[in-house]
Amino acid sequence: MKLTSFENDNENVLHSYIFSQQAKPHAAIDALFSALLPFGKPFIVQPGEEFSLYTEQSTRIVLLESGIFSICRSDRGLNVLSVFAPSLAGLIDSYGVTYDVPTRPEHFLIAETECRGRAVSLADFIKVTDECNLWHDVARFLAYRLMVMNVRDRELVGVDSYLKVRALLIEIAAYNDEDR
């Protein structure tokens, strides 16, 4: 039986940030934005400001039109993922609310740059997605997000500190000058 070593796995794969930009399902995002933007409430969030996915009335789906934000866990503030426009956020939290998942994960957003977008109520999101038959596009976006998380985990889980710092430096170097 041959054992495969994964020690240098990071040497032979595309970095998660570069992968996330190249694999982004633009057609699915465009279809979702086209149908949902008219139902969203516009927002602008400045760098360092938090944006809640929850209001007293509803959970919100965020359509990020410009900027970069971090998705953070509400319980510990742990940064889960950085998201670059165009993108969506709030699908996981909305699923938890819709299906009353006990001890569901909750998240909030922190703007890394000025962020502009629209916040769509969960009720409007479900209604429009049903009426416009957009669930395939939602599934494509969620599959994309899972792939990005998988690639990112390969860089961060089970590796030494050097490889984690190296992955972060590669990511920062790949950013556009204005985002860096």
What kind of region is each of these model predictions?
Residues 39-41, 67, 79, 105:
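Residue-level marker for the onset of beta-strands and adjacent loop->beta junctions
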Residues 40, 58-59:
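Short loop/turn microsegments at loop-to-beta-strand junctions
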Residues 41, 50, 67-73, 116-117:
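Short beta-strand segments in beta-sandwich/barrel cores
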Residues 50-57:
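Short phosphate-coordinating micro-motif centered on Lys-Gly-acidic
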Residues 59-77, 84-87:
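Glycine- and acidic-residue-biased ligand/ion/polar-headgroup-sensing regions
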Residues 80-141:
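Cyclic-nucleotide recognition modules
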